[in-house]
Swiss-Prot record:
Its cofactor is Zn(2+). Binds 1 zinc ion per subunit. This is 7-cyano-7-deazaguanine synthase. ATP binds at C7, S8, G9, G10, L11, D12, S13, V14, S15, L16, A17. GO terms for biological process: queuosine biosynthetic process. Zn(2+) binds at C185, C193, C196, C199. Keywords: ATP-binding, Ligase, Metal-binding, Nucleotide-binding, Queuosine biosynthesis, Zinc. Belongs to the QueC family. HAMAP family: QueC. One of its GO terms (molecular function) is ATP binding.
Length: 232
């Protein structure tokens, strides 16, 4: 299928892009600038598109992002350190983010005559982000079937929706994803901080997957104490 991948430049979506490139006809990568503090992830998405030899389009929705206040990703709120847990990561929720992006992505896909959109939501996000859950994916597909009825038939692919982050690392390694060129850290510094929830989750995923982590972290050992604290 001619498939457009929504790609942030993170480990999950880059792994997905490489998987789609091997299983389908990858037509383009689509990214969104919503005013996120970790905007450097978009550079990783661009590099991924160049490696895969497909177009990369960035949709500017910063005006929308500016209205979605109250999130550490779009507002002047500190990103918390610690394990990827509900009590620490709830502050990173951007209301309706995936719904907004997917609505635009379906429109772009229809205009470009694509047959599918792929999104890298995964099982580890279910307890924090409601628009990463299977029910949301199924409902959004149904909604788009009605929205594009008679105009386009586009499938929403979410192959990681029941997978763990470690599963994605294994899948990415299988398909040759360049992990070192991906960006996860929500703080958006020069290097991955190693302390925020996404950094801890990333580091733990490589450990559980048994895959070497090529990422340069400012604090490479914090993840161990964060996990010990979670398990205490």
């Amino acid at each position: 299928m001619k498939t457009l991948v929504v790609c942030s430049g993170g480990l999950d979506s880059v792994s997905l892009a490489y998987r789609i490139a091997s299983e389908h006809q990858l037509t383009a990568l689509l990214s969104f600038d919503y005013g996120q503090r970790h905007k450097k992830e978009l550079d990783s998405a661009k590099a991924c598109a160049e490696r895969l030899g497909v177009p990369h389009q960035i949709i500017d929705i910063t005006n929308i992002g500016a209205s979605l206040t109250g999130s550490a990703l779009t507002d002047d709120i500190d990103v918390p350190d610690g394990h990827y847990a509900e009590e620490t990561m709830k502050i990173t929720v951007v209301p309706n983010r995936n719904a907004i992006m997917l609505a635009i992505a379906f429109g772009v896909a229809a205009a470009q005559k694509a047959e599918a959109i792929a999104l890298a939501v995964h099982g580890g996000d279910h307890f924090i982000y409601p628009d990463c859950r299977p029910g949301f994916i199924d409902a959004f597909q149904t909604m788009q079937n009605h929205a594009l009825d008679g105009y386009a038939d586009i499938k929403l692919l979410a192959p990681y929706v029941h997978a763990s982050k470690a599963d994605i690392v294994i899948d990415g390694a299988k398909h040759g994803a360049p992990f070192a060129a991906t960006w996860s850290c929500y703080k958006g510094g020069e290097h991955h901080c190693g302390r925020c929830g996404t950094c801890v989750e990333r580091r733990e995923a490589f450990h559980l997957a048994g895959v070497e982590d090529p990422t340069l972290y400012e604090d490479a050992d914090f993840w161990r104490s964060a996990i010990e604290k979670r398990n205490a």
